């Protein structure tokens, strides 16, 4: 069997810059949406975006979840979800508990990846809800029925799927009832409260998080202290930050749900070796990633299910299918050296530790241009190595107090490189935490990543024109007028991607109309036409071009149209014709070659060999 010898030691990903984008997140999510379907959810209303129109709390919850399901397909297509109504007339669950209805569609497990059919039918659930499911108060004192307890039980059973090591498990609870047992007798209320809180605690002990999305009445704010504070486990500090009023409007609720669903997830787990015999566990979070279209998935033409790719190796000599593990060869001194896949993996492994501390340097040694790619945020974890948090805090405090950053070796199966570990202190405001404490891992550049800036002027040897003080003053005034306050790159969605997803959504859900996408990257014409901005622009133009900015300099136009003769580039610094005759063009730098090409209006793109050939062609050699 013939294999390419040069391919033996080739990395799976030869571009080290791509390893950031191709990191696989360590876990997926299992999510259960719990929706209160009591009559109170249908009676209570709040103002909608449209004037003179009211929306029920049930409609708000359903709309938020429908939007979240569509976002799941785009952002986290591997996540699995389930939808569960409680306080219902009908029941549908494996435990056969009253007042709980698990909504699903055929050919799908109770908790599974969201499908187009699930989203389409859930979008229409309000039209058929009263007929097929029905609303009914499920907490009845005389019968000892407790639909909230049953819903937590059913949700916990649904979340048994998957391991905590590979998945995060969450419940999202939508309700407008802040005291579900308020109308009960004291003894019954205490008993139901105790059993329900115990059921919630049992779920949390299994690693399941419960998050509340409350809906407030127009004339009454949701009081979380009556019951749900204990159910979701809020302490006094967290209670002050919890804002139940966010559920008053549909858009607020959608925004709140989006923030909770798209929480930061672990991009990778790292073992940080501080010294021999001492290592701690860190979780790495990707702070910034490019938004790209999803990868292509091949489907079976008959079942429309993803196809499973199987690969077989066939011997070219015998035609037989290779059963044994494939070995690779590397020619060495007229011999073919055999390597197994495991041996190659060990050869390419640079170090056993993932991240190893080398030393410390002053923060002044770290320059802005050293940060060439998005950094990774590191935070300690005691999940595997007990005491990691304590050691991390001691290191973090010392680095901040001494104004030092750590230099570490980041290797393993990834291309090796040096990284800078910069401690970040916690930033708080009146509304709570703005930035968490932790360490930013900055990927330091290789030596050839840092290059001198090329200074290219129209006339080599002539000083570049400098702006006057008045021009600088006018430019600063213009920038102040055009400054975007509280700017964040997250405010602007990629318009091409948004349209791409809108088209996919319309095709998958058989929608007649394409969802309108707004291009936030277009200039703000209304803002640019403000009198103060227009005045600043005109003053800047006048300072640069004078009273008549449209008049072009004749001398400038003539100078631009002139073509310099071959060999006259760089004011005689080099005789390019002579260098071409003697074959010494290769001794010039790329910048010097581009100077000749620029002077003769030739292309300057390509490698050094391409530039030399282009000069030789122009000279006629």
From Swiss-Prot:
<comment type="similarity">
    <text>Belongs to the ku70 family.</text>
</comment>
<protein>
    <recommendedName>
        <fullName>ATP-dependent DNA helicase 2 subunit KU70</fullName>
        <ecNumber>3.6.4.12</ecNumber>
    </recommendedName>
</protein>
<dbReference type="InterPro" id="IPR027388">
    <property type="entry name" value="Ku70_bridge/pillars_dom_sf"/>
</dbReference>
<dbReference type="Pfam" id="PF02735">
    <property type="entry name" value="Ku"/>
</dbReference>
<dbReference type="GO" id="GO:0006281">
    <property type="term" value="P:DNA repair"/>
</dbReference>
<dbReference type="GO" id="GO:0043564">
    <property type="term" value="C:Ku70:Ku80 complex"/>
</dbReference>
<feature type="domain" description="SAP">
    <location>
        <begin position="585"/>
        <end position="619"/>
    </location>
</feature>
<keyword id="KW-0547">Nucleotide-binding</keyword>
<dbReference type="GO" id="GO:0005737">
    <property type="term" value="C:cytoplasm"/>
</dbReference>
<dbReference type="InterPro" id="IPR006165">
    <property type="entry name" value="Ku70"/>
</dbReference>
<dbReference type="GO" id="GO:0009408">
    <property type="term" value="P:response to heat"/>
</dbReference>
<dbReference type="GO" id="GO:0000723">
    <property type="term" value="P:telomere maintenance"/>
</dbReference>
<dbReference type="Pfam" id="PF02037">
    <property type="entry name" value="SAP"/>
</dbReference>
<dbReference type="InterPro" id="IPR016194">
    <property type="entry name" value="SPOC-like_C_dom_sf"/>
</dbReference>
<keyword id="KW-0067">ATP-binding</keyword>
<keyword id="KW-0347">Helicase</keyword>
<keyword id="KW-0963">Cytoplasm</keyword>
<dbReference type="Pfam" id="PF03731">
    <property type="entry name" value="Ku_N"/>
</dbReference>
<keyword id="KW-0233">DNA recombination</keyword>
<keyword id="KW-0227">DNA damage</keyword>
<dbReference type="GO" id="GO:0003684">
    <property type="term" value="F:damaged DNA binding"/>
</dbReference>
<feature type="domain" description="Ku">
    <location>
        <begin position="273"/>
        <end position="471"/>
    </location>
</feature>
<dbReference type="Pfam" id="PF03730">
    <property type="entry name" value="Ku_C"/>
</dbReference>
<keyword id="KW-0378">Hydrolase</keyword>
<dbReference type="GO" id="GO:0003690">
    <property type="term" value="F:double-stranded DNA binding"/>
</dbReference>
<feature type="region of interest" description="Disordered">
    <location>
        <begin position="1"/>
        <end position="21"/>
    </location>
</feature>
<keyword id="KW-0539">Nucleus</keyword>
<keyword id="KW-0234">DNA repair</keyword>
<dbReference type="GO" id="GO:0006303">
    <property type="term" value="P:double-strand break repair via nonhomologous end joining"/>
</dbReference>
<dbReference type="InterPro" id="IPR005160">
    <property type="entry name" value="Ku_C"/>
</dbReference>
<dbReference type="GO" id="GO:0003678">
    <property type="term" value="F:DNA helicase activity"/>
</dbReference>
<feature type="region of interest" description="Disordered">
    <location>
        <begin position="545"/>
        <end position="569"/>
    </location>
</feature>
<feature type="compositionally biased region" description="Acidic residues">
    <location>
        <begin position="1"/>
        <end position="20"/>
    </location>
</feature>
<dbReference type="InterPro" id="IPR003034">
    <property type="entry name" value="SAP_dom"/>
</dbReference>
<dbReference type="InterPro" id="IPR006164">
    <property type="entry name" value="Ku70/Ku80_beta-barrel_dom"/>
</dbReference>
<dbReference type="InterPro" id="IPR036465">
    <property type="entry name" value="vWFA_dom_sf"/>
</dbReference>
<dbReference type="GO" id="GO:0042162">
    <property type="term" value="F:telomeric DNA binding"/>
</dbReference>
<comment type="function">
    <text>Single-stranded DNA-dependent ATP-dependent helicase. Involved in DNA non-homologous end joining (NHEJ) required for double-strand break repair. When associated with KU80, binds to double-stranded telomeric and non-telomeric DNA sequences, but not to single-stranded DNA. Plays a role in maintaining telomere length. Acts as a negative regulator of telomerase. Required for maintenance of the telomeric C-rich strand.</text>
</comment>
<dbReference type="GO" id="GO:0016887">
    <property type="term" value="F:ATP hydrolysis activity"/>
</dbReference>
<dbReference type="GO" id="GO:0005524">
    <property type="term" value="F:ATP binding"/>
</dbReference>
<dbReference type="InterPro" id="IPR036361">
    <property type="entry name" value="SAP_dom_sf"/>
</dbReference>
<comment type="subunit">
    <text>Heterodimer with KU80. Interacts with TRP1. Interacts with WEX. Interacts with OFP1.</text>
</comment>
């Amino acid at each position: 069997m013939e294999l390419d010898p040069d391919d033996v030691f080739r990395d799976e990903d030869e571009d080290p810059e791509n390893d950031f984008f191709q990191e696989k997140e360590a876990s997926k999510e299992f999510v259960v949406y719990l929706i209160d379907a009591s009559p109170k959810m249908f009676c209570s209303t709040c103002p909608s975006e449209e004037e003179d129109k009211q929306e029920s709390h049930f409609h708000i919850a359903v709309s938020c979840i429908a939007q979240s399901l569509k976002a799941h397909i785009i952002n986290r297509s591997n996540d699995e979800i389930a939808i569960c109504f409680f306080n219902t007339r009908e029941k549908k669950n494996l435990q056969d508990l009253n007042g709980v209805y698990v909504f699903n569609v055929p050919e799908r497990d109770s908790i599974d990846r969201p499908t187009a059919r699930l989203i389409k039918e859930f979008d229409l659930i309000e039209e058929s809800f009263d007929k097929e499911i029905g609303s009914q108060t499920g907490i009845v004192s005389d019968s000892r029925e407790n639909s909230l307890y049953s819903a937590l039980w059913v949700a916990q059973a649904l979340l048994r799927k998957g391991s905590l090591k590979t998945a995060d498990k969450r419940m999202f609870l939508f309700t407008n009832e802040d005291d579900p047992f308020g109308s009960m007798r004291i003894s019954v209320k205490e008993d139901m409260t105790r059993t329900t809180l115990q059921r919630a605690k049992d779920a949390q002990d299994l690693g399941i998080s419960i998050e509340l999305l409350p809906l407030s009445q127009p004339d009454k704010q949701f009081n979380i202290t009556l019951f749900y504070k204990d159910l979701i486990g809020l302490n006094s500090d967290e209670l002050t930050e919890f804002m139940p009023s966010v559920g008053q409007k549909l858009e607020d609720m959608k925004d709140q749900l989006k923030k909770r669903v798209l929480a930061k997830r672990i991009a990778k787990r790292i073992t940080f070796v501080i010294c021999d015999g001492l290592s701690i566990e860190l979780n790495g979070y990707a702070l910034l990633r490019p938004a790209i279209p999803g990868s292509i998935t091949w489907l079976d033409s008959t079942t429309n299910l993803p196809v499973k790719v199987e690969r077989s190796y066939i011997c070219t000599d015998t035609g037989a299918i290779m059963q044994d593990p494939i070995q690779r060869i590397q020619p060495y001194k007229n011999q073919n050296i055999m390597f197994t896949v495991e041996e190659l993996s060990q050869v390419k492994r640079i170090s056993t530790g993932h991240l190893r501390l080398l030393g410390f340097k002053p923060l002044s040694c770290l320059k802005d241009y050293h940060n060439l790619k998005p950094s990774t945020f590191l935070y300690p974890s005691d999940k595997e190595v007990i005491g990691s948090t304590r050691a991390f805090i001691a290191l973090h405090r010392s680095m901040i107090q001494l104004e030092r950053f750590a230099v570490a070796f980041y290797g393993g199966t990834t291309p090796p490189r040096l990284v800078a570990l910069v401690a970040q202190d916690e930033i708080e405001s009146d509304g709570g935490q703005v930035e968490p404490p932790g360490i930013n891992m900055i990927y330091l550049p290789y030596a050839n990543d840092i290059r001198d800036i090329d200074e290219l002027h129209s006339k080599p040897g002539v000083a570049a024109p400098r702006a006057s003080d008045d021009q600088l003053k006018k430019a600063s005034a213009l920038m102040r007028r055009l400054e975007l306050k509280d700017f964040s790159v997250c405010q602007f969605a990629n318009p091409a991607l948004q349209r791409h997803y809108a088209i996919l959504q319309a095709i998958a859900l058989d929608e007649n109309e394409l969802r309108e996408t707004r291009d936030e990257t277009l200039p703000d014409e209304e803002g640019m036409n403000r009198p103060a901005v227009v005045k600043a622009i005109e003053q800047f133009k006048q300072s640069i071009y004078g009273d008549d900015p449209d008049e072009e300099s004749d001398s400038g136009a003539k100078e631009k149209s002139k073509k310099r003769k071959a060999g006259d580039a760089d004011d005689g610094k080099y005789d390019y014709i002579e260098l071409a005759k003697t074959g010494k063009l290769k001794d010039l730098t790329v910048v010097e070659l581009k100077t000749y090409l620029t002077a003769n209006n030739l292309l300057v793109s390509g490698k050094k060999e391409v530039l030399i050939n282009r000069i030789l062609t122009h000279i006629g050699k």
